[in-house]
């Protein structure tokens, strides 16, 4: 059984159909990719998977559970999905450690701190938890965003053009690093990109 299953989904804005009859299956632990030019509906598909947009037709299942149909939407907070955006979306007033631990506020301080330290090491930023986002480079900020998304151990990770704000050299290096991090975390993920090189560097 697929971990993520999109079955003949349609997505529309008003009367305008932006995605028609899309089907996709992704096995647990694999990294998939939606590759295409800007404006073709890739990000809209991610928003539908995350629970922010309603289907016009079809069905989405996550780990066997129906999470979206035209008449049913499981709320985003109950889907256990992590997201990484192209603009990092870090909280500027919080330290790196507090950004990463933001989704772990229900855990005890000891559990939260241990998880944050584990993730800082995983993304190659051990010992830098007290810094603030403005003190980090673009590549480091994107790693912090990835660590924050991975912190609650999501069932699925969605990456929406995560390297588009980085220069070409850093983008190429970070794409391989991100793949290694996702694999080390044993996480299922989908990358959205318009860049063929990124697609082949990150996805299975």
Regions found by a protein language model. Name each.
Residues 66-82, 106-114:
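ABC ATPase NBD coupling module
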Residues 146:
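Hydrophobic anchor residue at the start of the ABC signature
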Residues 65-68, 110-128, 179-186:
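Conserved ABC ATPase "signature" region
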Residues 157-161:
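Catalytic Walker B motif of ABC-type/P-loop ATPase nucleotide-binding domains
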Residues 94-101:
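Short coil-to-helix segment of the ABC ATPase nucleotide-binding domain corresponding to the Q-loop/switch region
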Residues 35-37:
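The feature captures the beta-strand-to-loop junction immediately N-terminal to the Walker
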Residues 131-134, 152:
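Conserved signature/switch motifs of ABC ATPase nucleotide-binding domains
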């Amino acid at each position: 059984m697929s971990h993520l299953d999109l079955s003949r989904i349609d997505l529309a804005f008003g009367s305008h159909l932006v995605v028609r009859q899309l089907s996709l299956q992704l096995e647990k632990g694999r990294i998939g990719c939606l590759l295409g030019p800007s404006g073709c509906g890739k990000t809209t598909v991610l928003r539908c998977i995350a629970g922010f947009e309603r289907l016009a037709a079809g069905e989405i299942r996550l780990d066997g559970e129906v999470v979206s149909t035209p008449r049913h939407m499981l709320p985003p907070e109950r889907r256990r999905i992590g997201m990484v955006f192209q603009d990092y979306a870090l909280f500027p007033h919080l330290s790196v450690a507090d950004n990463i631990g933001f989704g772990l506020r229900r855990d005890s301080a000891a559990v939260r701190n241990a998880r944050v330290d584990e993730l800082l090491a995983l993304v190659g930023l051990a010992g830098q938890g007290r810094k603030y986002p403005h003190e980090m480079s673009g590549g480091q900020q994107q790693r912090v965003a990835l660590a924050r998304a991975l912190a609650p151990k999501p069932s699925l990770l969605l990456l929406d053009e995560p390297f588009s704000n980085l220069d070409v050299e850093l983008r190429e290096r970070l794409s391989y690093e991100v793949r290694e991090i996702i694999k080390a975390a044993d996480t299922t993920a989908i990358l959205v990109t318009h860049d063929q090189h990124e697609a082949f560097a990150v996805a299975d």
